[in-house]
Amino acid sequence: RIYNPVAMAAKAKYNVLGERIVPRFLVDYFIVRNVLKATFDIQFDINNTKNKSFLPQIATGRPNTETVVNRAYDGDIDAFNVSTQSTLLYTPNFKSEKHSLVAFVKVLTNDYKAVFQEIMTSNTASSLLIDPSIPSRTQNSELRAVSGTTQTRSIGGILSAQYSFKDKYLFNAMVRGDGNS
């Protein structure tokens, strides 16, 4: 499609407003100094986006009856994500320096939820009427009004141990399990 660039610059609209904040908190705590350490990590991700656009008939040069003229769009999505990671680290001090052990258990969680709504219409009565909620057409699959939510959750667990004898022989074992919905 070929559009009139002067009319696009003067009459078309395309606005995107996004706001995002990602705070993260981390706590390290020695339950038993240099032997047993707990770490707790949590991160929030809040992302909000608002889109508005309008394609006027004078920019397209197409007849007023086609669905590509006076096309208005308004969309909003709000996404929320919470991730956590909890670790318990065990590093005992042996009397003999020939032995060393590092073991940990870790639990990871994630929760994501998004709420969205959007509407796209065409053939508003005038190029001055740029809001899709006013009377206009929604006759094909592109032109629609939809809303909904999505949510996913996951959890993972790790159990790991590494034993060393004389810094020469290493034995490592790890088990991991995951689940989601």
Predicted regions and their residues:
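Surface-exposed loop/turn segments flanking beta-strands in extracellular/periplasmic regions
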Residues: 1-7, 56-70, 115-145
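Outer-membrane beta-barrel transmembrane strands
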Residues: 5-53, 73-94, 102, 114-116, ...
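Carboxylate/His-rich catalytic cores and anion/metal-binding grooves
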Residues: 38-40, 90-136
